[in-house]
């Protein structure tokens, strides 16, 4: 007997990717339901070789559904996730709505799988921010060996992190530039085509943006509350794939060679680090891939026990959809949930 799975936000970038990955990985699902708002009702989405008709979230009964993959934004999640959880269905939420709730585990399976047992408090599990997910996958194995004191990260985040509207705006603006049409910025605060924008999410009182704060807060929650983290988040004209320049200061000595060996053996990490032209990974090459790619590992001569590295991953997969499905797999593989239809 398989599990009954509902995907909320099935017509969005991440929702569609969730359906793709459920099929690709052969998740033990007896039934998969595609859900979205009333305006998307009847829309068709792909699930493996099948076509699913999108149903209206408002009319759906979760009482016999085992897992809900929620990717419809924070407002929808705040309204629906507690209701769904109260019906006995486990919600794996991709928004920021529940990440900082003390009763909701924030999970990256390669980093803090044991924390998942706390899901029973509310039947909600939070997926981290896309840029945080790949960062902690790369940091965790190094922290286990040499203990991280401080992290300075600059992110170079693709437009798909802003949804389909962000991807459409980059395409439309790029075309407009080439044909000398006026360029209009709607989704982003400034033109994104052939430009970079040092601003993602709302500004906070201290001058940081909410996106930058998320990286700090989530890294501390999942990895170690004592780690100091500072971040600058930048939107770049790339369709898929987030990149990060990461500077790390450790309490204990660690060399670049040691770091390479550690990361090569670490789950979810793939080291591509040759000191030659093209001996590194860019977001173009990581699109559609599951791994967190790590390149440019080198020692920082300006600080004791310091390293620099370049971290790249597909933000729609490890940064969102893949991590959510890995959480669902963790629930199943550890026997934390059973198919309700079989009960």
Enumerate the language-model features and the residues they cover.
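N-terminal Rossmann-like NAD(P) cofactor-binding subdomain of oxidoreductases
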Residues: 1-192, 228, 256, 261, ...
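Terminal hydrophobic/aromatic helix or amphipathic segment near a protein terminus
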Residues: 253-287
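Glycine-rich phosphate/pyrophosphate-binding beta-alpha loops
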Residues: 234-237, 313-318
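A glycine-rich, Thr/Ser-enriched phosphate-binding loop motif common to dinucleotide/cofactor-binding enzymes
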Residues: 123-134, 207-216, 319-323
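Internal helical hairpin/lid segments
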Residues: 231-232, 237-267
